[in-house]
Amino acid sequence: MARKGRPNKRRKVCFFKVNKIKHIDYKDIDLLKKFISERGKILPRRVTGTSAKYQRALTIAIKRSRQVALLPYTAE
């Protein structure tokens, strides 16, 4: 009989540490869109796997790009 239960989950690694990205630019829309849900919300750390340091920088960059109208506040 097969074991039932939770499937094995891999530990998520920080995207920015793996790709050696030091600075998150608010003008890099393609990068920022990876961390925004389809509803326009910023995805939490537990979903994306980013470290606390880069999550804070990512949040600031997303909010800046919204302020300058590069990203929408909500989904269309």
Curated annotation (Swiss-Prot):
UniProt GO MF annotations: small ribosomal subunit rRNA binding; structural constituent of ribosome
KW Hydrolase (keyword) present: no
Record-linked PROSITE patterns: RIBOSOMAL_S18
GO biological process: translation
Family: Belongs to the bacterial ribosomal protein bS18 family.
Top-level taxon of the source organism: Bacteria
Keywords (A to Z) from UniProt: Ribonucleoprotein, Ribosomal protein, RNA-binding, rRNA-binding
Oligomeric and partner information: Part of the 30S ribosomal subunit. Forms a tight heterodimer with protein bS6.
Organism: Brevibacillus brevis (strain 47 / JCM 6285 / NBRC 100599)
GO (cellular component) term, any one: cytosolic small ribosomal subunit
Name of the protein: Small ribosomal subunit protein bS18
InterPro entries: Ribosomal_bS18, Ribosomal_bS18_CS, Ribosomal_bS18_sf
Protein purpose: Binds as a heterodimer with protein bS6 to the central domain of the 16S rRNA, where it helps stabilize the platform of the 30S subunit.
Cysteines joined through disulfide linkages: none
